[in-house]
From Swiss-Prot:
Name under which the protein is recorded: Aminopeptidase G
Entry function: Hydrolyzes preferentially the N-terminal glycine and can also hydrolyze other amino acids which are used by PepN but is unable to hydrolyze basic amino acids.
EC number(s) from the headed UniProt entry: 3.4.11.-
Keyword list, A-Z: Aminopeptidase, Cytoplasm, Hydrolase, Metalloprotease, Protease, Zinc
Residue ranges of the TM segments: none
Organism, as annotated: Streptomyces lividans
Amino acid sequence: LQMLHAWTNSALVHYAAPDWRETGGRLLGEGALRELRDGRRAASSSWPGRGSSRRWRPGRRTGAAARGCWRAP
């Protein structure tokens, strides 16, 4: 489990690069990219518990990175 955790952290470091939006768009599809684009507006509705954009953005990046790495190993 710790090895998996370290691997996920390295993947997060990779996907949290400055071009993480483009990478996420390629991995998750156009719908997810659109959701990322105007996600700050719909953060409270689609992500309960993450109302503030300051706490919401890193969590959203983590979710995109996790889904991206699992979909394209």
